[in-house]
C-alpha cells in the first residue's frame, strides 16, 4: 500500500473518533475513548475554531478535506491527553503491522518503504487525537449522535464501506470492529452537519 493512500485513509477516519483498532500487543494499553470526556475537559485541550457560517475555500480538495483542514489549522491546541496519544500510537503501529503481514513484508521494511519511523507514527497519533477532540467538541455542542435506528438501518452499508476502506473482510469487521463502524457513521453525520452549515466552495 502506498504511503499517500495509507496516510489519507488513516487521517480521514481519525478526524472523528475515536478508537482505532484493538488487537495484539496493544491490549496492554488501556483503551481511550475521547468521546467519554466531558465538554469542559475537551475544551481544556482544544479551543475549536468557528465551525458554523464560515466561508471555506474548496480549491482542489473535497468538501470533507477542506472542512477538516480548516478546523485543524484554525483551532487552538492547548495540550493533548498523553494517554490518548500513547493509545492511538499503539493502534497505528498495529495497523501498519497488519498491512505488512497482509503484503508479506516485515513491519520495519514497510515503514522504511513509506519513509516512516516510530517518531513519525507518534506525530501522526498526536494529529489524530487533536482532530478527534475537535470533532468530539462539535458533536457534544450540537448534540450529534447516532440513533439506534440509524445503527440498524445503515450498519450493513457501513460494514462494506469500512471493509473496503481498511482492507478487512466484512466478516472480520462484523465480528471485531462494530464500534469503529458506528464511529464512522458518527463522523459522516458530523461532516454532513458541517457541510450544510458552512459555505464551502
Q: Where are each of the predicted segments found?
A:
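N-terminal secretory signal peptides that target proteins for export/translocation
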Residues: 1-3
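Peptidyl-prolyl cis-trans isomerase
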Residues: 24-114, 126-201
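Sec-dependent N-terminal signal peptides
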Residues: 5-16
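C-terminal motif of bacterial Sec signal peptides marking the signal peptidase cleavage site
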Residues: 19-22
Amino acid at each position: 500500500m502506498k504511503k499517500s493512500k495509507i496516510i489519507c485513509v488513516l487521517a480521514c477516519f481519525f478526524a472523528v473518533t475515536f478508537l482505532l483498532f484493538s488487537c495484539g500487543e496493544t491490549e496492554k494499553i488501556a483503551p481511550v475513548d475521547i468521546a467519554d470526556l466531558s465538554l469542559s475537559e475537551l475544551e481544556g485541550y482544544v479551543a475549536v475554531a468557528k465551525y458554523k457560517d464560515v466561508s471555506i475555500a474548496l480549491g482542489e480538495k473535497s468538501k470533507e478535506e477542506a472542512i477538516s483542514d480548516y478546523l485543524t489549522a484554525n483551532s487552538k491546541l492547548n495540550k493533548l491527553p498523553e494517554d490518548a496519544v500513547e493509545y492511538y500510537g499503539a493502534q497505528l503501529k498495529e495497523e501498519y503491522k497488519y498491512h505488512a503481514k497482509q503484503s508479506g513484508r516485515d513491519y520495519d521494511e514497510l515503514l522504511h518503504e513509506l519513509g516512516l519511523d516510530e517518531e513519525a507514527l507518534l506525530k501522526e497519533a498526536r494529529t489524530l487525537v487533536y482532530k478527534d477532540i475537535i470533532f468530539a467538541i462539535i458533536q457534544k455542542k450540537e448534540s450529534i449522535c447516532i440513533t439506534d435506528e440509524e445503527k440498524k438501518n445503515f450498519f450493513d452499508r457501513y460494514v462494506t464501506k469500512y471493509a473496503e476502506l481498511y482492507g478487512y473482510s466484512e466478516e472480520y469487521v462484523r465480528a471485531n470492529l462494530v464500534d469503529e463502524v458506528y464511529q464512522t457513521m458518527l463522523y459522516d453525520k458530523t461532516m454532513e452537519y458541517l457541510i450544510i452549515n458552512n459555505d464551502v466552495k
